Amino acid sequence: MKGIILHGGHGTRLRPLTHTGPKQLLPIANKPMSQYCLESLKEADITEIAIIVGGIGSNKVKEYYGDGSKFGVNLTYIEQDSPKGIAHAISLCRDFIDNEKFIVFLGDNIINTSIRTFKNNFVDGDFDASL
């Protein structure tokens, strides 16, 4: 099982806060929004994670998360050259996913509960997708 965190978009509705970086790095309770996504995946024993980056501040995302080791995960960065939607971003992960099941997080969404049961039901289930 692998994880994908979408970290794209321009964050225009949050300007001027997003003039210099992505909205997913804006802090909520002293940590970036997308860190909650990463921690949810790790808590569910998903440690192979791709972060889709693109637009302003991609380098800041890479600087903050690095290779993922300080969070106990392995990170792969995948560039999305222009915002073409969620389906396009996920399609860029084809090689990373390598026919495994995967969970997608939008980097600016915070789920304040464990995803472990959801993940286990998906892994054990005989279906292609779960929402």
Segments and roles (model prediction):
Residues 113-131:
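Conserved donor-nucleotide/metal-binding helix-loop-beta segment in metal-dependent transferases, i.e.
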Residues 19-24:
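Short alpha-helical oligomerization interface
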Residues 2-5, 13, 27, 31-106, ...:
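Conserved N-terminal catalytic core of the sugar/cofactor nucleotidyltransferase
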